[in-house]
Structures are given as C-alpha cells and as structure tokens.
C-alpha cells in the first residue's frame, strides 16, 4: 500500500518535471513490486514454508475458523449425545412410543400437493401453492397434519381487468389431512375439506374467517424451483446447502456438489404476475359497487335472494379496515401512476368507501417493511382459536462479513445466520407482527434500537400461535451441512477430516435415484426429556460413503418451551447401524416387493417410492417408506403399500399397522396392541408365587428406573438406554407372573 502510494506520488512529481525517461523506470519498479509482492513471494512462501509444514502453519487459522463458524451458525450450542443404536425395538418400546407411531408421516409433500390439487381445488380459479406440516391436538391427541390454503389463481382466459381487481379478490378455506392415514382408495384422510369448509367434529376449532386476501400466491411454474430464502434489497440469497464437506480453513470455503440456484432478481415493486395459464393480481379493490365473489355455489345459477351469489357465486363484502382508502380522485390518480394502470381512473365501480389492497404476497409484504431481514420461502398457515387463518413467516439476520466464518457456498457469501424474528401475517387483514425470538443476537439488537416500535417480545405471541411455531427447515439444512465438518473441534482432526460426515441419501420418486434426504418434521418421544414433541430430524453417514452405516442423526426442537434446542445423537464407536441406502438396497433385494413393483409398473401406472423416514424408537431405529401408485394419465397419487424395516427385516403391508404387525409378529394398531388383544388379568396358577408378592422383584424394577433417571440427568444416554431396557424386561416378567396375557 505504502509502495503504491509512494509510486503514485513519484509519478506525479516526474510528470510535472517532464522527465519521461525516469517515469518509465518508476512504472517498471511498480510492476516489479506488484509481481514479486502479489505473485512470486506468496507462491514461494506457500511452496517452501507452508506446504512442508501445512498442518502446523494452518493450525491457528483452523482454530479461528472452527470457533467462529460454529458461533456464526449456532453450532456451538449443539449438544452431543449418544444413541445406543440397538437393531430392533421391543414391543414395550413401541407402547412407550405409541404417539410417535401414530404420527409417522406417510404423505410426502409432492404427492400431497398433487392429491390436494386433484381432489380439493374444486373450481377453475383455485389452487394450492404448497403443503406444510404442522401439529394440532385432535380428539385430545397430538396429531401431525398436512395443511394447505386454497388460494386464487385466475386463468388467463377470464383475467379481465374487472375480474382481476374487483370480482376475484381472494382465496377461500383450508385443506387439512392426517399425515399417517389414508382412505380405502389410498387418498388423503381429510380433517378439513370442501367449500364452505367442512370441519371434522374432533377438530377443536371452526374456521370463521376463511377468506385469504394475503397469501403465498406461488404460480404452478414456480413451485418446483423455489429456493430456501428471499433476500432484501441489500442481501444475497443463500443457495441450497451442499451435502458434502470439503477442506475448510482460513481463506477457503466449503464447496457444493450441486449447481448454484438460479439468481433471484432484486427486490422490486409488486406487479401483476402472468404466465401462459394464470394471472395473480398485484392489487385488488374492495368495497366497490361490483360484487366480490366469495365462493361458487353448487347447483345454483343466477342471482339468488339476499347475497346468495352472482352467476353461481356467493357474494361478500370486505369488512376490515385494512388497505388504502382510494375514494378520492387525487388518490386514484396517484395510484394509477404508481401501478401504471388507467383502470383505477376510469372504472366507475369505485366509491368513496373503496379500499386498495396491495403487497398481497406475504413475502413481498414482509420484505417491504423489513428489507434488512432474510426471509424464509416456506411460510405456513395456522388456524387460530377464534377461527382465523394466520401465516407464520421465519426471517433471519444475516451478514457476509463475519470474520473467519465459512460462507454457505462459494457463490453465496453469507456466513452468519440467525432465526432471530418470526412474523405473523393475518390472511384477511394483512396485519403483520414481528416477534423477536433471539433478542441476544447482536444484529437484531441493532435493528431493535433503530426500529423500537417494530419488534415485540416473543412472550407477547398469542398462545394459539405459539403452539404452532416450527424450526425452519432452511436454517436446519444449513446447520446440518456445516455440522458435517464442524462437529470436529480438534484442529488436527479437522485438518485430516478423520470423522467427516455427509447428509444421508435415499432413493425416492419414480426413477429411484439417490438424493440427499431433506430435513423432515415428525412427532417423536424426545430422548432428552421423554415427552412427545414435534421435531426436525436429519441423518448422517460417513463422508464419501453414502451407502454405508449411519454415524449420527441431528434433531431440532420446535415446541415453544424448547424452541431452537439442537442435538446430535452419535452411535457408539464400532456400532453398525444401517444407513438409508442399505435399507433401500434391502428393499430392492426383496423378491416379493420387487415382484409387486414390476406388476404395478406394467398396468398403465407407475410406482413412486416415498421418502424414507428414520425414526428413533427407544434404543433402536425404525425405517418407514410409503409406496404410491399413480396412473400415467392422471396425476393423482394413491398410497398402495407401506414398507417398514428394523433389524435385518423388511416387510411390506397394506398400511402402517399391517406392516408393523408383520415386523413384530404382534397385532399392533395406532401404536399399541389392537383392542381385541389388550391386556387382561387371569388368576395366577397356584403353587407358583407371583413376583408381586415378592418385594425384591418390585424393588429391582424401581432400581432400574432410578438408574435410568440418574443417567438421563447426567446426560449418559448409553447407560440410560441400558437401564431402560432392563426396566422393560423386568416389567414384562412382572406382567407374566401377575397373570397379564397379551
């Protein structure tokens, strides 16, 4: 720097003197300095100093990189535990995990989206942007569900100006189904369906405000290529995280084995979106003279009595005070210029009471208020206790300038990420509320000082919203990818990659090609506190060996009281636990299953293999994979079979319970024994004293339970699993001796 500055000053001095000969020597000296300082000297240091002693020279930089990267992605708060990895769960463990079994997800998002679109669109103007997973207490039990709002997609052939902005203003209703159940035809088992919404009696809420004026509105062409984040005006968009680690140190980055995502355009003012089939209006006008169509009436045409429809539609009138008043000519002129739309000036249906609703896409809406936040592209709807539909949007604080931290990918330089804020957006009014979920985040602290009235404390979130918060999949995927390398904190081990991991792979879809497993939501009995919880999971295999055994799995808590708690459960050294590819190979090698697949593929239909779910059940793992059948001409997938594996066995049943019954050779339903196989007492045989009469048998059971409790409190999960197994065995002995039959 000083040499360059001196050279510039010397050049200016010689130019003033007119000494061009000496000026040439100055330029040559500057070039030689650049050549030696920027190219030759660093290369020589690398070749003769660093390379022969690379590990020693890199160690201090690796230490900094490990510490700062773990902090930047919150990996320093990940707690390491051990999972026993036993080959086969016992029937007693199945009983203990009955809620988890009753919530095993059989419906994948892609198949559900196709099924919902075929069965529940119900009208030309309606469609589904996405399907999301959530949980509700239904019939007094925790149940995982799939939920999708029915949004408005206006076909181009009827997308006149009046239809776009005055008549068709909103979507209508919610579709919800249980993720574990399906009908006899293999279709989803609906909890909420149809128009007007038909809600099952066991569901605790009724939908009293089904209109959706503010939603995702993702066109069908955009569904398959959505990326995990939306950037603000000055932020970059992280790519889909890589699934394999490479050497990372000071001055190097992790490399992705996937192509970079298509670039996201800079934030723009909202505008009408049009494709070859559909149009989504940039704004709508409410409280006008024109009828606002609410939903189609079946079997009725023409105008009925009162507000019962226009041309077969029920009419409605917007009741909220949201939107911008647009009754005056002056405002109409300004907004006509704003949207470059003369219709706002020329239309005669606008009245002094009329209002304009804009920024109707919730991601654009949130970004317009907080462009400094990175926005997750997977918002999801929640049904509140008063029957409203509210969107939850995850947002992040992010920067590209965190020292020593490794960026997400070479193309995207974001190297600090926090799920600091959650935003709720009312689907009817568009009202937004920003809740600070990580008030200790330094970046969020700065934003809260700059905008003191924008953010609320997380405690202010209503209870019926708190019950449905989720840990974002996009952040968890990034953290899991980083964890593949950064679970190693020893710089020498890190340098050698002695224990590098990668995201496990599965075979899914029609072609069955290996693809990385996506993080998946599920209900499990949490190993760390023994409670049934909604969690996010992902498995790991050794780096470069996706077809080998699993080495660990990672979990994130979603429930409010444990939100953001991260765990990695490693398997004991030398313990061989089947990885997903090994299970897939076992499925492919099963003669009976292969015969069924071949038969179905020859009948004008195609077999689609669902996602392989790996679920911890007690000290073991349970592997579940649904099988769909879809006609070649109709995109309506149906669940045909369910494959379950544990230990070295693979079975295929007509449903989950049939498969579990085959696997464990015990009648099982809903996670417990079938009703006709419930326990019942019988009189013990005389002459053989029952252990119940012997206090030592009961004391032994209590000792095992106490040992398990102490092990859990100390975080010794290997001892916890062993003690719990002994307690189950002793309990089974007591059951048999007491005269309990199954």
What is the predicted function of each stretch?
Residues 1-714, 718-740:
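Soluble extracytoplasmic regions of secretory-pathway and membrane proteins
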């Amino acid at each position: 720097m000083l040499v360059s500055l001196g050279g510039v000053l010397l050049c200016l001095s010689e130019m003033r003197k007119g000494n061009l000969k000496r000026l040439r020597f100055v330029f040559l000296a500057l070039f030689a300095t650049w050549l030696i300082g920027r190219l030759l000297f660093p290369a020589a240091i690398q070749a003769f100093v660093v390379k022969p002693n690379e590990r020693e020279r890199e160690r201090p930089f690796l230490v900094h990189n490990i510490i700062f990267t773990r902090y930047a992605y919150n990996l320093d708060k990940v707690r390491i535990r051990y999972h026993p990895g036993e080959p086969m769960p016992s029937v007693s463990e199945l009983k203990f995990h009955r809620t988890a079994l009753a919530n095993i997800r059989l419906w994948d998002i892609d198949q559900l989206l196709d099924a919902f679109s075929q069965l529940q669109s119900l009208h030309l103007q309606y469609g589904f942007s996405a399907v999301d997973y959530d949980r509700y207490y239904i019939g007094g039990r925790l149940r995982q569900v799939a939920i999708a709002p029915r949004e408005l997609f206006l076909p181009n052939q009827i997308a006149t100006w009046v239809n776009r902005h005055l008549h068709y203003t909103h979507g209508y209703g919610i579709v919800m189904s249980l993720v574990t159940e399906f009908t006899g035809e293999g279709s989803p088992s609906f909890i909420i369906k149809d128009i007007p919404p038909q809600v099952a009696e066991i569901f605790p809420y009724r939908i009293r405000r089904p209109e959706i004026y503010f939603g995702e509105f993702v066109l069908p062409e955009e569904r398959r290529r959505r990326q995990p984040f939306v950037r603000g005006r000055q932020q970059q968009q992280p790519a889909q995280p890589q699934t394999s680690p490479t050497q990372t140190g000071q001055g190097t980055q992790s490399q992705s084995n996937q192509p970079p995502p298509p670039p996201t355009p800079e934030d723009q003012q909202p505008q009408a979106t049009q494709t070859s089939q559909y149009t989504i209006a940039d704004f709508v006008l409410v409280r006008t003279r024109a009828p606002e169509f609410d939903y189609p009436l079946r079997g009725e045409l023409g105008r009925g009595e009162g507000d019962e429809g226009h041309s077969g539609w029920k009419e409605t009138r917007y009741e909220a005070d949201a939107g911008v008043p647009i009754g005056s000519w002056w405002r109409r002129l300004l907004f006509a210029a704003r949207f470059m739309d003369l219709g706002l000036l020329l239309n005669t249906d606008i009245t002094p009471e009329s209002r304009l609703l804009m920024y109707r896409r919730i991601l654009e809406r949130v970004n317009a208020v907080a462009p400094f936040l990175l926005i997750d592209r997977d918002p999801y709807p929640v049904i509140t206790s008063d029957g409203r539909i509210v969107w939850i949007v995850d947002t992040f604080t992010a920067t590209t300038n965190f020292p020593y931290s490794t960026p997400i990918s070479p193309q995207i330089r974001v190297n600090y990420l926090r799920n600091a804020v959650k935003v709720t957006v009312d689907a009817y009014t568009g009202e937004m509320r920003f809740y600070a979920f990580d008030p200790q985040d330094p970046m969020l602290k700065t934003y809260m000082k700059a905008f003191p009235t924008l953010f609320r404390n997380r405690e202010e979130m209503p209870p019926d919203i708190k019950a449905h918060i989720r840990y974002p999949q996009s952040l968890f995927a990034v953290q899991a990818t980083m964890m593949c390398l950064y679970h190693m904190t020893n710089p020498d081990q890190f340098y050698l990659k002695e224990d590098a991991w990668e995201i496990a792979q599965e075979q899914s879809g029609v072609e069955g090609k290996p693809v990385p497993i996506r993080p998946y939501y599920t209900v499990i009995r949490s190993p760390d506190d023994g409670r049934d919880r909604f969690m996010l999971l992902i498995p790991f295999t050794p780096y470069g060996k996706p077809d080998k055994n699993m080495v660990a799995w990672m979990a994130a808590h979603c429930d409010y009281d444990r939100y953001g708690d991260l765990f990695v459960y490693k398997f004991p050294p030398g313990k061989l636990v089947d990885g997903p590819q090994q299970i897939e190979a076992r499925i492919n090698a099963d003669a009976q299953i292969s015969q069924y697949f071949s038969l179905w593929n020859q009948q004008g239909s195609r077999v689609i293999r669902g996602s392989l779910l790996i679920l911890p059940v007690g000290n073991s793992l349970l592997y579940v994979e649904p099988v769909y059948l879809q006609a070649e001409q109709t995109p309506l997938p149906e669940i045909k079979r369910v494959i379950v594996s544990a230990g070295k066995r693979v079975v295929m049943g007509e449903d989950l319970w049939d498969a579990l019954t085959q696997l464990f050779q015990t009648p099982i339903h809903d996670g417990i024994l079938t009703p006709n196989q419930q326990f019942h007492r019988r009189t013990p045989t005389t002459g053989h004293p029952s252990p119940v009469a012997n206090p030592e048998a009961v004391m032994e059971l209590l000792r095992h339970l106490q040992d398990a409790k102490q092990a859990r409190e100390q975080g010794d999960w290997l001892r916890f699993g062993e003690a719990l197994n002994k307690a189950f065995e002793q309990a089974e002995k007591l059951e048999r001796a007491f005269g309990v039959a199954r």
